[in-house]
Amino acid sequence: MSNDILLQLDKILDARKTESPETSYVASLYEKGLDKILKKVGEEATETVMAAKDAEYTQNNDNLVYEVADLWFHTLILLSHQGLSSTDITNELQKRFGLSGHEEKANRSKNDA
């Protein structure tokens, strides 16, 4: 997967911070603050779960892909609001690459102690 689209979205989301909430959906979320953004992420996560269940039943993944894209988009808005970007996440994933889930979890537990 190319990281280019994520980097492009990072730039757009950052630019929306200075745009009018009346003309930009993203700017309106930024203006409403963290709680509104978290609510949207939660809504999109729920819709993703429901789409996955539907996809299993219908054997059609189109809506699942659509909902995951919405979830990713709103998660990127959250990251941007918090001063982070997709690069922060891809860097974290890169650190975990090659580790089993059990190893990653054990390392996390040691760091939390």
Curated annotation (Swiss-Prot):
Localization of this protein: Cytoplasm
A GO cellular component annotation in the UniProt record: cytoplasm
Describe which pathway this protein belongs to, using the record's wording: Amino-acid biosynthesis; L-histidine biosynthesis; L-histidine from 5-phospho-alpha-D-ribose 1-diphosphate: step 2/9
Q: GO molecular function: any one?
A: phosphoribosyl-ATP diphosphatase activity
Q: What does UniProt give as the signal peptide span?
A: none
Name the source's superkingdom.
Answer: Bacteria
Q: Does the keyword Ion transport apply?
A: no
Keywords linked to the UniProt accession: Amino-acid biosynthesis, ATP-binding, Cytoplasm, Histidine biosynthesis, Hydrolase, Nucleotide-binding
Q: What is its main location?
A: cytoplasm
Question: What's a Pfam family this protein contains?
Answer: PRA-PH
Is Repeat found in the keyword set?
no
| SUPFAM superfamilies in UniProt | all-alpha NTP pyrophosphatases
The EC code for this enzyme is 3.6.1.31
Q: Which cysteines are joined by disulfide bonds?
A: none
GO BP annotation list = L-histidine biosynthetic process
Catalytic reactions of this protein: 1-(5-phospho-beta-D-ribosyl)-ATP + H2O = 1-(5-phospho-beta-D-ribosyl)-5'-AMP + diphosphate + H(+)
Q: Which family does it belong to?
A: Belongs to the PRA-PH family.
In its UniProt entry, what is this protein called? Phosphoribosyl-ATP pyrophosphatase
Question: What is the source species?
Answer: Hydrogenovibrio crunogenus (strain DSM 25203 / XCL-2) (Thiomicrospira crunogena)
Starting at the broadest rank, the lineage of the source organism is: Bacteria, Pseudomonadati, Pseudomonadota, Gammaproteobacteria, Thiotrichales
